[in-house]
């Protein structure tokens, strides 16, 4: 049975890296990285372009098509509102797929530091854009609030699996992720 795996976690925690690795090692899996799709829309750096209004339906349509074909989808994306998770879960259910919620977590202060380090170490346009975007909206305080919101959400998601994510431990974290997906329901 196909599955839709939502890889959640604070910004900069390793969601995109681990999802790309998962798709690479599980042929046929669609790594539906929202950050990548976002960049496909012309003018995505212009806030007035409201790119998210286009990207969200695109992501859902792509996931639906992949699941209809009986293939897995992995979606690396921070979500901290219950309705965002419910929408993904409902999409999977309507396509006859299993929904899995995996949350990557590090300590709060480490997660905030990892976001900053990512921008210092990587000149990728999207990473730099998001660093500026978050910085203009409160920086570390905003990241802390996002982390706290994610922890609050976890209390509402009894079926979510938390996977510890340590900076630089990609293979170790990947092993825990795949173990979690092989567990009940995976």
Tell where the protein language model's regions lie, with residue ranges.
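Glycine-rich phosphate-binding loop used to anchor ATP phosphates in small-molecule kinases
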Residues: 54-99
